[in-house]
Amino acid sequence: MDTDRVIFSTQWIAVRESSQGFQYLERNGKDSVAVFLLRKSGENPAQYDVLIRHQHLCIDNQEVNGRLKLFPCPITGALDEGESSEAAAIREVFEETGYRVQVLPLGKYVVGTQVNEVCYLYYANVTGIVPDEAQEDGTYLESIGRNEWHPFNYLEMCEYSACQIGFFKLRKILFQES
């Protein structure tokens, strides 16, 4: 894909055209991670909460009471140049939540047919871990995001594709479903 022609670019994105004439979007950093943080939520060993990051998305973003509408997502972020997906997942979790974790792989998916991005999915159980203060990356969009714990099944009703994929993959792991 490095030989594909750049039609338009900014410091954040490029629109490219392949030798077959297919045009697609490539964002700086290209690939991304989505991380699901879980904690036990009661006596039942099969009861979990999931940390949801409410953040800005580029679509359907009306202001509500003078504030941008936020959408439920897992912890997400782009891979830095030369960074592994696992290292990016650990870094993003610390930046956005303050948790220091080791992550477990959950799979990956192609984000869409009009972009060349792969999203790597991870999860970590943070039951009993006390987080440090979230570092954030200094951007306005990250500063308006917020984290909230919800029952695990909350993921099923989130519209963000990583939430849907994560819900079904995690349900298999956590509840030993086939």
What are these regions (language model features)?
Residues 2-44, 58:
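Acidic, metal-coordinating catalytic segment for phosphate/diphosphate chemistry
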Residues 33, 72-163:
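Unchanged
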Residues 32-37, 61-66, 142-145:
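A short, polar/proline- and glycine-enriched secondary-structure boundary/capping micro-motif
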Residues 12, 29, 68, 115-116:
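A short, structural micro-pattern
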Residues 155-178:
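Long hydrophobic alpha-helical segments typical of transmembrane helices together
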Residues 34-36, 49-51, 121:
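Residues embedded in well-ordered beta-strands
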Residues 46-90:
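Glycine-rich adenosyl-nucleotide cofactor-binding module
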